[in-house]
Regions:
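PAPS-dependent sulfotransferase catalytic core
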Residues: 192-202
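Non-catalytic, well-ordered alpha-helical segments in soluble enzyme domains
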Residues: 9-10, 171-185
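Surface-exposed loop/turn and secondary-structure junction residues enriched for glycine/proline
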Residues: 148, 167-168, 201
Length: 202
């Protein structure tokens, strides 16, 4: 997210944490907390997923969003569809490294982290008072992976996290070429800005 935000939303490729805010997270609490719905269950916000995306797209411009969601249906409600999503970039990480990352992040054992990854009912939940205002279903690591990598609804670029770390410049170039293709942008990639983004985001 930092690379994309600094390339597209800065004038010169210089890194700024404020620019990261240009790429919002969806579906997060901010999109649903003003509904009058009681949201008694975590998954209740799923009924408004498409509606909120339609509202965003009324602005008739291209937005970038970060999501942890699996590409799924909850209670018959699609996470997104071809009318609201132009394309996706999916970053996949070696599951062995994911276990370590989860263990460090949540201060749990690697065994607990492994069980976390296998949990088919795993999700990220936001709650305000008695209302579940945010829900991102993760599912298990393998189901999450399949949901995006087997997607045929719209173009999906698969990027390995390890490639992004070890060979950031060429990997980010692929990302920019992909974005250029799906958005039908005529402007060439600004190589100097690209290199500056990579250097400043290290």
């Amino acid at each position: 997210r930092s690379l994309i935000s600094n390339y597209f939303f800065s004038d010169d490729g210089n890194f700024s944490f404020n620019l990261i805010k240009q790429i919002d997270s969806f579906p997060s609490s901010k999109f649903f907390k003003n509904y009058q719905d009681k949201f008694e269950k975590p998954e209740d916000t799923s009924k408004y997923w498409i509606k909120e995306q339609e509202k965003i797209n009324l602005k008739n411009k291209i937005f970038f969003f970060k999501t942890h969601n699996a590409l799924c249906k909850i209670n018959g409600n699609k996470f997104t569809d071809i009318n609201n999503t132009l394309a996706a970039i999916y970053i996949v990480r070696d599951p062995r490294n994911v276990v370590t990352s989860i263990a460090n992040h949540y201060q749990i054992t690697t065994r607990e982290a492994f069980d976390f990854m296998k949990d088919k009912k795993r999700g990220i939940i936001e709650k305000e008072g008695d209302r579940f205002t945010g829900f991102q279903p993760l599912f298990s690591w393998d189901l999450h992976l399949k949901s995006w990598t087997e997607n045929t609804l719209y173009p999906t670029l698969i990027i390995k996290y390890e490639d992004l770390v070890m060979d950031t410049t060429s990997t980010f170039t692929k990302v920019l070429e992909f974005i250029k293709g799906v958005t039908k942008t005529k402007n060439n990639i600004d190589k100097q800005k690209l290199l500056k983004c990579v250097e400043n985001c290290k």
